[in-house]
Curated annotation (Swiss-Prot):
The gene is Gltpd2. SUPFAM superfamilies: Glycolipid transfer protein, GLTP. Belongs to the GLTP family. This is Glycolipid transfer protein domain-containing protein 2. InterPro entries: GLTP_sf (IPR036497), Glycolipid_transfer_prot_dom (IPR014830). GO terms for cellular component: cytoplasm. One of its GO terms (molecular function) is lipid transfer activity. It comes from the Eukaryota. It comes from Mus musculus.
Length: 321
């Protein structure tokens, strides 16, 4: 019985099923309308600059949707088909999502940025290494490393002398033969300067720019490994001193006498903590950003090292010193 009217059993069963179905239908319709307006789909031909709508312009609702959203049929919706005045004329531009701002320490005025820039520039498209830019990168690397601790000062003191020696060749009377790593190797080989000491009377690789660069090349590898491990070391893992010590054992210790190795290991004990190194590398930023910046810088050093390693190996000069 419905509202005092007796219904047949079949009609009663129909009402019992129809009412829940009608409620479910209305609920689904409500959800679909909400979903339609909350999650707009890409419509390339109707892009606008309304960032609040994710840069997309929605079509005007149909009469049915308009009635459900208090838009009577025939009345303009709140999303007109015509573009807004601010969206027309010469000022109209496609929506561009700004990229994350570069970290200051990687910029032209940051220590890492000043170091990375010449090292990137030294790698020519032809596969060579420009010596003037390579040495400029080394100058900035020395300036960056020296304040980081005793261990870096220990390593950079010798590197400074080698950079100065090569710069004298780049700007000296034979400067035309020292424009790049390839031109230097070619000329010094022709001049008989690439014989290992003791292999041929009257000739010594000790006076060659190629030998000096090889020593810098090994030091660059140690710097790159140390900075990379400081940047990527896990929390609770080995401290920065341990990781830089391992880098020294890999890159430089095999080429140093016993006394130098012991002095280097003592210097590593004074290495600042990882957090302090990150602050010095990228001041004014959080640890996560500093790690990213230092890892990028170490990646550039690795690219330069790999390029130089390939050229030296190709000419059989890795054992020159």
């Amino acid at each position: 019985m419905v509202m005092g009217v007796s219904l047949s059993p079949a009609l009663g069963r129909w009402f019992r099923h129809a009412i829940p179905f009608a409620i479910l239908t209305l609920l689904l319709l409500y959800i679909s309308i909400w979903f339609f307006y909350e999650w707009p789909f890409p419509l390339p031909a109707q892009r606008t600059q309304q960032s609040g709508l994710r840069g997309l312009k929605l079509p005007s609702p149909s009469p049915v949707l308009g009635s459900l959203l208090s838009f009577p049929a025939g009345v303009q919706s709140c999303n007109p088909e015509r573009p807004l005045p601010s969206q027309t004329g010469p000022a109209a531009r496609p929506l561009v999502v700004p990229e994350k701002e570069e970290l200051p320490c990687l910029g032209p005025h940051g220590a890492l940025g000043r170091m990375v820039s010449p090292f990137l520039a030294c790698m020519s498209p032809e596969g060579d290494v420009a010596l003037s830019q390579y040495l400029a990168g080394w100058r900035e690397l020395l300036r960056f490393l020296t304040p980081l601790g005793t261990v870096f000062a220990f390593a950079t003191s010798e590197a400074f002398n080698k950079v100065t020696d090569l710069e004298a060749r780049v700007h000296g009377p034979n400067a035309s033969h020292y424009t790049s790593l390839m031109t230097m190797i070619t000329w010094e080989r022709g001049a008989g300067l690439l014989q290992r000491p003791g292999t041929e009377p009257g000739h010594s690789a000790g006076s060659s720019g190629s030998r000096t660069l090889l020593l810098l090349h090994r030091a660059l590898r140690w710097s790159q490994l140390c900075l990379h491990r400081v940047a990527t070391g896990t929390l609770g893992g080995p401290d920065a001193g341990t990781q830089c010590g391992e880098a020294y054992s890999t890159a430089l210790a095999p080429h140093h006498p016993w006394l130098i190795r012991q002095a280097a290991r003592l210097a590593i004990l004074a290495l600042p903590s990882r957090g302090r190194l990150l602050q010095l590398a990228c001041p004014g930023t959080g640890e996560a950003d500093a790690r990213v910046a230092l890892a990028r810088a170490a990646g550039v050093l690795e690219d330069v090292y790999n390029r130089t390693q390939g050229l030296l190996a190709g000419h059989g000069l890795l054992q020159l010193a």
